[in-house]
């Protein structure tokens, strides 16, 4: 989740190597930087994705899957359900470090890559014992962008007292430690903790968080000391008119909102925080999943997009899911304007679009001009007419296109070890998208992203069980995949 600052790319193809030359503009000077990145299939596993018809020029390159041998790492298994991810330069100058949440095994892996993007070794910096909770989306804070770090923020789910881990991506691996959580960021079943950039609110650290619960909140952590994750205050989002019902917000309307303090949040339990919702009049969303801010200017960085994935059986909540835009006040992060920008239930003109539009949006990746909305359709709502997709939402026009699809129902995969015969084999949404991460500015190649796939039907006995070698074992034993995609519009 990086700021766009690559202005020119000249590409040379030398035999099988792709050499990229990029120029960064800094104070009216240009400093050429050369990327040695090579884009090719590195995994023994075929790609689990395919591009939408309007994006056939996007390159797909497998990076790693659960059945690959990780070099110089013994019997390490890259776990299934790869989700939130961070990608940084290795401080020793040898290449890159990629850290990944493995949602259903409650662990965080770390892979080292050379400058060509070949994986050279790996380990687990958080195992199931240290993870304590399901770990979904995540955000890498860096000094260049956020003013502190590097620090990987991984918010726990699946427990009302879950918290956000703050993990050093370059330090020694102490995977079982349980003391890296940050109580000041609140206790709730969460999805992500996203720090805004250092220019969004100079001199402050502002972090937006989402609660993945049937009565889900949007929280904001604010500290007047950059990088302080222990002594700031926590706030919760509400409408100024204090209407808490999600479906009372409708298309083509702007809603004035504010963040109200959660008193003594650092010392509250999760149930105590939840019990405050009635008195604080916070908006009750249908499971707030991922959040991200718009890249580019400081004003852009105060423009946030988040998704409510939807629940069944409640007229007060979205069913198929929504995406919201939240614009924060330039001078006060506690004030803003909220509106609907995508809705899986009804179109802006009132047409029923259940099952044909977005279905259970789970992750978002926001660039300067687009929002990439990743779906998790494994609630198997009966109206569904498509697989879990990634949609490209155009911020300027408000229109959406299908960016990416899954391959699990293609002839080559049906009946294979990746999607064997079974009750769910032909269901829409049986596979889901994990995080999509913009790594363009890290490697110096514009339009380069990682994308993670939860291939839930792919099991191989117990080969993928307990990949982090923890004492406590989660029963999940499906494989997963991470890919590199290139020439992605930003």
Residues covered by each model-derived region:
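Short, surface-exposed linear motifs at loops/turns and structural transition points
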Residues: 16
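C-terminal motif of bacterial Sec signal peptides marking the signal peptidase cleavage site
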Residues: 19-22
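Sequence/structural signature of beta-propeller domains
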Residues: 24-490
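Bacterial N-terminal signal peptides that target proteins for export
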Residues: 1-10
């Amino acid at each position: 989740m990086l700021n766009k600052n690559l202005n020119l790319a000249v590409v040379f193809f030398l035999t099988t190597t792709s050499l990229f030359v990029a120029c960064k503009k800094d104070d009216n000077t240009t400093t050429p930087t050369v990327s040695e990145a090579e884009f090719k299939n590195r995994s023994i596993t075929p790609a689990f994705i395919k591009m939408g018809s309007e994006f056939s020029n996007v390159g797909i390159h497998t990076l790693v899957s659960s059945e690959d041998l990780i070099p110089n790492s013994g019997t390490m298994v890259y776990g299934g359900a790869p989700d939130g991810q961070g990608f940084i330069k290795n401080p020793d100058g040898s290449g890159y470090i990629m850290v990944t949440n493995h949602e259903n095994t409650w662990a965080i892996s770390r892979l080292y890559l050379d400058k060509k993007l070949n994986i050279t070794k790996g380990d687990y910096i958080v195992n199931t014992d240290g993870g304590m909770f399901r770990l979904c989306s995540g955000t890498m804070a860096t000094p260049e962008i956020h003013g502190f770090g590097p620090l990987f923020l991984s918010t726990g789910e699946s427990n009302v007292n879950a918290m956000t881990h703050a993990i050093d991506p370059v330090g020694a691996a102490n995977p079982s430690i349980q003391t890296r959580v940050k109580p000041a960021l609140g206790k709730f079943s969460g999805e992500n903790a996203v720090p805004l950039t250092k220019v969004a609110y100079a001199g402050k650290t502002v972090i937006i968080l989402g609660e993945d619960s049937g009565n889900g909140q949007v929280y904001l952590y604010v500290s007047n000391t950059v990088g302080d994750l222990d002594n700031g205050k926590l706030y919760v989002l509400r409408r100024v008119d204090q209407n808490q019902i999600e479906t009372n917000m409708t298309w083509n309307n702007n809603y004035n909102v504010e963040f109200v303090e959660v008193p003594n949040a650092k010392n509250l339990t999760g149930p105590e925080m939840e019990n405050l919702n009635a008195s604080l009049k916070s908006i009750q969303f249908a499971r707030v999943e991922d959040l991200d801010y718009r890249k580019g200017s400081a004003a852009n960085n105060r423009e946030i997009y988040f998704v409510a994935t939807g629940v069944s059986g409640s007229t007060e909540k979205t069913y198929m899911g929504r995406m919201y835009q939240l614009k924060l006040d330039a001078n006060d992060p506690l004030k803003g304007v909220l509106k609907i920008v995508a809705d899986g239930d009804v179109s802006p003109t009132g047409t029923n679009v259940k099952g044909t539009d977005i279905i259970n949006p789970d992750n978002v990746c926001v660039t300067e001009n687009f929002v990439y909305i990743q779906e998790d359709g494994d609630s198997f709502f009966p109206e569904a007419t498509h697989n879990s997709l990634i949609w490209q939402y155009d911020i300027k026009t408000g229109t959406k296109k299908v960016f990416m699809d899954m391959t699990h129902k293609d002839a080559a995969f049906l009946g294979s070890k990746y999607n064997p015969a079974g009750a769910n084999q032909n269901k829409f949404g049986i596979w889901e998208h994990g995080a999509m991460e913009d790594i363009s500015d890290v490697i110096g190649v514009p339009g380069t992203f990682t994308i993670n796939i939860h291939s839930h039907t792919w099991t191989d006995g117990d080969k993928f069980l307990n990949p982090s070698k923890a004492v406590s074992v989660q029963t999940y034993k499906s494989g997963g995949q991470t890919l590199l995609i290139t020439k992605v519009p930003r």
